[in-house]
A protein has these predicted regions:
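Intrinsically disordered, Pro/Ser/Thr-rich cytosolic linker and juxtamembrane tail regions that serve as
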Residues: 1-176
Length: 176
């Protein structure tokens, strides 16, 4: 339909943050690369406490899609969307899986969780900068719901999105 193809052409950028407190057990941000690293933390005082990514989303992107893209962008091993499709969990049930949720912080609201099926755009108090993507440009990233974004696309009224580890009884399946 014309509407859904137009929705995929309209994009906006979010700022997504991951704090070191939301890394799986025995992981830390590498002091040089910033990537999550498994093992014993080095005895360095200046380990990064957070990492940020800018993601350009299709207008109709869901919270679950952002969580999946965040897991990939931050290179989190064995991580899945909390409340997402359990088919993959059943096929790989022998491995512990960290489940992640998405929270939002804005000037008008304290941090609060977002439902995985909800649209990201619905979380905004004020609409973000919506940009049409030139469909004549033959780039693979146009086919995806999520693509890399840039800081310049973030407005001062835009909220901060936070990737959080699910903090409940099934935080990590298979881990006692």
């Amino acid at each position: 339909s014309t509407t859904s193809s137009q929705d995929k052409q309209l994009r906006f950028t979010i700022q997504l943050v991951l704090y070191d407190t939301d890394l799986p057990d025995n992981m830390f941000f590498h002091p040089t690369t910033g990537n999550p690293t498994r093992g014993t933390k080095p005895l360095i005082q200046d380990l990064p406490s957070e990492q940020r990514r800018f993601m350009r989303l299709a207008k109709n992107a869901t919270v679950a899609e952002v969580i999946e893209a965040g897991i990939e962008a931050f290179q989190l091993p064995d991580a899945v969307v909390d409340g997402g499709d359990d088919v993959e969990d059943r096929t790989r049930f022998s491995r512990p899986r960290c489940k992640y949720v998405l929270h939002i912080q804005s000037a008008s609201h304290n941090e609060q969780p977002l439902h995985p099926a909800s649209k990201v755009l619905a979380a905004y108090d004020t609409l973000p900068l919506l940009q049409f993507v030139d469909t004549d440009v033959k780039r693979k990233s146009l086919d995806f719901t999520v693509a890399p974004g840039v800081m310049d696309d973030i407005l001062s009224t835009d909220p901060l999105f936070v990737l959080r580890i699910a903090r409940d009884k099934y935080k990590q399946e298979g881990v006692v």
